[in-house]
């Protein structure tokens, strides 16, 4: 669904003085903690006790859909609807809202409604979607906080499809709005839109990125580097869609289904005729961009991508027109009126076969994009397309399910899906969980089980590491991972290097024995899941470490986690959650391409941590000695498994001088300044808490003589927070 005018990333300065340099400008390699600040503040005008899920449940969804359906054919003079129907515009808006999602870190996607903010609102691929959102504004104002922009944009896409004759698979609300861009997202290394510096030598897009070009949702619709090469385009399509967890069948269904509707706009060259994007537009345009320099930006003069024309003879009806046109006719490349490469039919039969979008006396000829021809030229995609052509019902079902997946992929498990149109069928990509068909343990059983766990042969550090391994897979970006489900015991997690598989097998075996013995002993229907037992064991161990330091703490525990099975788990998809760096366990892979401390902060953001919470967490874990392979790296204490502030006291000690270790770029030796003897060993992750100015300021608080009790309580609070991040059933 590409519409891509040329643009750069510069904004109009209006003759004002240059922007003052930030610290990041002065010191580009300085560790940027700004992404954690997002987790420490509320920037929107929303009350502290506002519950969006509760408000959405009060919404009359049918009334909203009725208003949307009326809007579809209520063409506005300031932005007339193609063919008298806004449906294709709203499909593109919804697609481009959701289509930024990538599996690598779970960021992007429809959550937050971040298409409203830079840079996404000004990407060339999103040209004129500002108009779509303005068309929706009266409906958003009418229903207020009962429906978020994030939910409304996806709902508008669904209603658009339904209003043109297709039955969607379902719709779920529950996406809360953000009020700023997500500063944690790495959109790529380029300095200008529609450029690409993200491919390595074998042609693979850099790890973590989704799109192949800066400022585009997926790929260049003209073909790679603007060359009309369908075979090369197919490779880019497959790679980019794979990075949002779409296989060939889903990809083909989405493209074919989406391109069944509407047209692209290229009445003239966008580079010569369009004004600046919203972020660079003058203030009087009030956030609207891409104005036609010749004065007419709408109707038949509309310019978006520079590619011009419809795909089918019935652009506002669901039919087989796209697939039939693509497969049954031959196509040849040509430069369209906007100067971009597109494909024209060789057959006279298709010429002038489509009504004009605005002038009833005119006719247009269907066109195809290079990315469309790719579905015909690539043998695997073609096989799928031919199957769809022979089986229209299969095509429809595949499009319906792929559209549902596209627009809901970042919402997390099924219990977060709200509203009357949520399908009964749970999808494997939702990481579903079984229901608990037993009574949950109470306070008496919790105390009994904690005592039994601590009386076992398992150490404090083993229990802490296991609970952390289970819970820390959580990603707040797409709500995947976490301790619920106990997927730590399943493939692939049980064999991840960071989880020390042999030791993990021992720990889980002991916990499973305790679980079996407890469950078999109960005749009252009370049972405990392994998922709960893993977290309970970690809590008990942290409480023991605090007791070893003289502090009596009790970590709140709410049972209710369940154990998922292989049938609930798409094992390959969980590899995206495997950490290359787990700073909390001081695990660093040798082949990482970014400084370990950057990955530490990135992971902390996915856990929704602040800089202070991260600091307390690291200090506490080091004092406990909960390191990968039980190394002494960063364990600046003579009393491991004791929750103290020794890590900070010794990190800040000026009697220690640090130097890089000879055997690893990630390791350092702490030498006694007087004797030269090695006192400690550490990683970059440890030393960043004394090097970075902000982290050092926090460390100095925790390293004070009166701060140990504060550290213990802050660590316990942060630990408890992480253990419950995926407990959506408690919300």
Curated annotation (Swiss-Prot):
One of its GO terms (cellular component) is cytosol. The record marks 92 as: Transition state stabilizer. GO terms for molecular function: catalase activity; heme binding; metal ion binding. Its cofactor is heme b. GO terms for biological process: cellular response to hydrogen peroxide; hydrogen peroxide catabolic process. Heme b binds at residue 259. Its EC number is 1.11.1.21. CDD domains: catalase_peroxidase_1, catalase_peroxidase_2. Residues 1-10 have a biased composition (Polar residues). PANTHER family: CATALASE-PEROXIDASE, HYDROPEROXIDASE I, BIFUNCTIONAL CATALASE-PEROXIDASE. Belongs to the peroxidase family. Peroxidase/catalase subfamily. This is Catalase-peroxidase 2.
